[in-house]
Design a protein with these regions (language model features):
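Active-site loop segments of alpha/beta catalytic cores
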Residues: 1-145
Length: 145
């Protein structure tokens, strides 16, 4: 959960976020919101704030990709959800391949999905698993034009 209540977020944080997003849009830029943890209590305000993307979508924090996609639809691009807590450090390349395939099945419909780690590619991530994530994304993640 966020460190502050949704009410305080709306009062003290989001007005400034909106100004940043609006200015970026005036400059022709896209804006991705990076916010760790469980974002459900802020999801509606984040969607209304005009962000183009939401990152990192941590499965260990309750941000199941299929559920987030069902809720958000095509209103925002989703980035992340390949577990960097256990899977990328300690899993096998085959397990990573399976997780990427599942993420794409869960959230690629209609576009708006960028596969990446659920937070970062930190020093504990097994390089072979990082490569497996990239390769699986290429294998399963192309859209037919």
């Amino acid at each position: 959960a966020p460190l502050i209540s949704p009410e305080h977020f709306n009062t003290f944080i989001n007005p400034y976020n909106r100004k940043l997003v609006d200015r970026a849009r005036q400059l022709g830029l896209r804006v991705v919101r990076h916010s760790d943890g469980n974002l459900w209590s802020l999801m509606d305000v984040l969607l209304a704030s005009g962000y183009d993307g939401l990152n990192p979508l941590e499965p260990h924090a309750g941000m199941a990709l299929k559920k987030v996609k069902a809720y958000c639809g095509d209103r925002i691009c989703l980035l992340g959800n390949i577990d960097c807590v256990e899977l990328l450090p300690d899993g096998t390349p085959q397990q990573v391949d399976t997780a990427v395939k599942q993420a794409i099945e869960d959230a690629a419909d209609g576009g708006g999905l960028i596969i990446c780690s659920s937070n970062s590619l930190h020093p504990g991530v097994n390089p072979e698993n990082c490569i497996a994530m990239f390769e699986a994304t290429k294998k399963y993640g192309s859209y037919e034009a």
